Amino acid sequence: MQNVINTVKGKALEVAEYLTPVLKESKFKETGVITPEEFVAAGDHLVHHCPTWQWATGEELKVKAYLPTGKQFLVTKNVPCYKRCKQMEYSDELEAIIEEDDGDGGWVDTYHNTGITGITEAVKEITLESKDSIKLQDCSVLCDEEEEEEEGEAADMEEYEESGLLETDEATLDTRRIVEACKAKADAGGEDAILQTRTYDLYITYDKYYQTPRLWLFGYDEQRQPLTVEHMYEDISQDHVKKTVTIENHPHLPPPPMCSVHPCRHAEVMKKIIETVAEGGGELGVHMYLLIFLKFVQAVIPTIEYDYTRHFTM
């Protein structure tokens, strides 16, 4: 039944997107949405700092006139996925469905019981090293640094702007050498762990209706054979399957359909992050959008080790 509902919603949104005019004036600071030009600028910034991501065109007949022909969407391929979501430690007590009647089946607050007051106070005490802009260190340089801490759990989308990830503490902001750590875990797991290794192709498109980026993914087994929908769902947080994540056709590529992270809350989350940075005396540039976007959607696909900024300082 949920699949039928998602299909109907998908068709309705296709019509709505077609009828929605292209956003011309920047509303990033006010609402968290971006124009196609800002999407391209953020994409260029992502490609520069994380070169595993590249621009692509897709099918000629599906080219969107409001985007440059050679910059229709972003793609990164052969992204490793070393384990299934069910293999990760999980506790129902740490999650709660929020806004169950919002029309999308409810959203998951991953760290519901971790102490909201403490988190809020931590965000209020943010100190910014630079009040003019955000400084970013290149991913390729930081990949070579020695790691002394264990991997941290993925932050949920609504938790991100409150969790302290915006603090200037480098130990907090420095996401770990994820790929190497996961490889080590796979090696330690023996032959069974190796056989479970999958890869994913990830895509970021511009959603004209929601006026935000949208993430797509398609998976393959260890023989590079396409995964079934049910197999891909194994690599997605089960509380987001068929709610936040649905199966839809890629707007620039031919079938088969792909998993897509629904963008209905992206602007809202980004707006909160912008406000948090501003309260600390800083300014979040729109060029940082995709780097932060990839961080907060990690909660949905926690076992897929894609490339995003490893360190940024407010």
Swiss-Prot record:
Active site: 264
Site note Cleavage, residues: 169-170
Top-rank taxon, per record: Eukaryota
A molecular function GO annotation: Atg8-family conjugating enzyme activity
Enzyme class: transferase
Modification(s) after translation: Conjugated to ATG12 at Lys-243. ATG12-conjugation plays a role in regulation of mitochondrial homeostasis and cell death, while it is not involved in PE-conjugation to ATG8-like proteins and autophagy. Cleaved by CASP8 upon death ligand binding such as tumor necrosis factor-alpha. CASP8 cleavage blocks survival-related autophagy and favors apoptosis.
One GO cellular component, as annotated: phagophore assembly site
InterPro entries (alphabetical): Atg3/Atg10
UniProt region (Interaction with ATG12), positions on chain: 140-170
EC number, UniProt record: 2.3.2.-
PTM sites of type N-acetylmethionine: 1
Keywords, comma-separated and alphabetical: Acetylation, Autophagy, Cytoplasm, Isopeptide bond, Protein transport, Transferase, Transport, Ubl conjugation, Ubl conjugation pathway
Cross-link (Glycyl lysine isopeptide (Lys-Gly) (interchain with G-Cter in ATG12)): 243
UniProt motif LIR motif: location: 104-110
Short sequence motif named Membrane-curvature-sensing motif, residue ranges: 4-19
Motif Increases ATG3 translation efficiency by the ribomome assisted of EIF5A: where in chain: 101-103
Subunit structure: Homdimer. Interacts with ATG7; this interaction forms an E1-E2 complex that is essential for the transfer of GABARAP thioester from ATG7 to ATG3 and disrupts interaction with the E3 enzyme complex. Interacts with ATG12; this interaction is ATG7-dependent, essential for phosphatidylethanolamine (PE)-conjugated ATG8-like proteins formation and also mediates the autoconjugation of ATG12 on ATG3. Interacts with FNBP1L.
Domain notes from UniProt: The membrane-curvature-sensing motif targets curved membranes. The N-terminal region works in concert with its geometry-selective amphipathic helix (AH) to promote LC3-PE conjugation activity only on the target membrane.
Function text: E2 conjugating enzyme that catalyzes the covalent conjugation of the C-terminal Gly of ATG8-like proteins (GABARAP, GABARAPL1, GABARAPL2 or MAP1LC3A) to the amino group of phosphatidylethanolamine (PE)-containing lipids in the membrane resulting in membrane-bound ATG8-like proteins which is one of the key steps in the development of autophagic isolation membranes during autophagosome formation. Cycles back and forth between binding to ATG7 for loading with the ATG8-like proteins and binding to E3 enzyme, composed of ATG12, ATG5 and ATG16L1 to promote ATG8-like proteins lipidation.
Family note: Belongs to the ATG3 family.
Protein name (Swiss-Prot/TrEMBL): Ubiquitin-like-conjugating enzyme ATG3
Organism: Rattus norvegicus (Rat)
Taxonomic classification: Eukaryota, Metazoa, Chordata, Craniata, Vertebrata
